[in-house]
Curated annotation (Swiss-Prot):
InterPro entries on file: Lipid/polyisoprenoid-bd_YceI, TTHA0802/YceI-like_sf
Source species taxonomy: Bacteria, Bacillati, Bacillota, Bacilli, Bacillales
Top-level taxonomic group: Bacteria
Name assigned to this protein: UPF0312 protein SAB2563
Family: Belongs to the UPF0312 family.
S-S bridge residues: none
Length: 171
């Protein structure tokens, strides 16, 4: 069994969504945690739970961030966390239950395991995992949008994300 200790200082969770049909808005969640258990040498034994604090959303625009925290989007007063719990892990895919605003759907994402390395700063063994995917926000009750005069809508329904998580590991 491998012991995994999440390193939030060397991890990130970023997203992007189409805006006004012509560009993308990018942002991040600044507070999240990932708990992993299992044997790093046997992917089938790995189980993970990610917990994201939606009120930590950061798009570098306070007014937009406040709107995203409102009931139009994440409703952070009522829903204080987003979770992802794995059901299965392979070398390049992860399947699990994603819960946003109390709505749970099974999702499949791409995963990249980057092996094990020795940290030259403290001698610890570390590993990294990068998870990427696309989420249809409307499946989670995040339906806010506005029609554009030129056709189309203000916001795309698909949100692309990349989560990069680093862990100290020990046996």
């Amino acid at each position: 069994m491998t012991n995994f200790t999440f390193d939030g200082a060397h991890s990130s969770l970023e997203f992007q969504i189409k805006h006004l049909m012509v560009s993308k808005v990018k942002g991040s969640f600044d507070q999240f945690d990932v708990a992993v258990e299992g044997d790093i040498n046997d992917f089938s034994t790995l189980k993970a739970t990610a917990t994201i604090i939606p009120s930590s959303i950061n798009t570098k625009n306070d007014a937009r961030d406040n709107h995203l925290k409102s009931g139009d989007f994440f409703g952070t007063d009522e829903f204080d966390k987003i979770t992802f719990e794995t059901k299965s892990v392979t070398e390049n895919k992860v399947v699990g239950d994603l819960t946003i605003k109390g709505i749970t759907n099974e999702e499949t994402f791409d995963v990249e395991f980057n092996g094990v390395s020795k940290n030259p700063m403290d001698g610890s063994q570390v590993t990294g995992i990068i998870v990427t995917g696309t989420i249809n926000r409307e499946k989670y009750g995040i339906n806010f949008n506005q029609a554009l005069e030129t056709g189309g809508v203000m916001l795309g329904k698909d949100v692309k994300f990349e989560a990069s998580a680093e862990f100290s590991i020990s046996e």
